[in-house]
Amino acid sequence: MKIAFIGLGNMGGPMALNLHKAGHTLRAFDLSADACKKFAAEGLPIAKSAAATVDGAEVVISMLPASAHVDGLYFGSGDQAGLLEKIPAGTLVIDSSTIAAATSRKVAEAAAKRGIAVIDAPVSGGTGGAIAGTLTFMVGGAEADLERARPVLEKMGANIFYAGGAGAGQTAKICNNMLLGILMIGTSEALALGVANGLDPKVLSEIMRRSSGGNWALEKYNPMPGVMETSPASKNYAGGFGTDLMLKDLGLSQENAAAVRASTPLGGLARNLYAAHSLAGHGAQDFSSVIKLLQTKGA
């Protein structure tokens, strides 16, 4: 299958590479010359522009940082035309960016008028899942379009869920990430309290992991350095899912909550804590570094 892939960041790059390795004919692009150079060295064909990727493509995939980037890509900005004016009718567009559900619906509605099918398919699983091809896709759009996309998604992920109409995938994603942000703060708070009282963080982590407080962070992503060798915490919080990305997703959750008048007090508090953590200079560190905000000074 001929696929255009736009966005070769920490997630998009490995996803595109998995499609290339699976035998699909790819043309990829990123605004970052370094990203293009990195994946070209791994054999990924790189186009000169986003517009150049879609020529002859049966499927267009985008993996971009925020709503504004997706809006600019498909609708254009200034004198530059958007991709919707270049993508032929009958093409399937898969947007795996995590953005506002309203933006996904806007793109899908405009595309439908041109005979272009669009699904929003944000992912969960982190960079490790992107590399291993074990991501979880949360899909919004027409169910028939998901079935068209399934052979492509299966080369990048292990779990594919149909959430509903356009924008539903985005809503599912921000619900998941709101819970993840809250969960990480709660886990960090408990560990910081235990350590402040002289407990060994490894022992406390195991106690909680095997008790009613057990959760994904304790199992896979412990925020305390030295407890879990594979977690970003033991690598000076490098890599993983950045604090600023978590802050963005929590912001999306609160915008959505306000739009539908849903009560999310813990989501709002989590957003405020991550905002404070980012302002303290930790925006580029993994989101589990929020434990620094909660630790007793001098501990």
Which sequence ranges carry the predicted segments?
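Rossmann-fold NAD(P) dinucleotide-binding segment
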Residues: 50-62, 66-117
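Hydrophobic beta-strand scaffold residues
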Residues: 26, 46, 117-119, 160, ...
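Rossmann-fold dinucleotide-binding core
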Residues: 8, 98-177
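Helical "substrate-binding/catalytic lid" subdomain
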Residues: 169-269, 273-298
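NAD(P)+-binding Rossmann beta1-loop-alpha1 motif at the extreme N-terminus of oxidoreductases
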Residues: 1-63, 91, 161-162
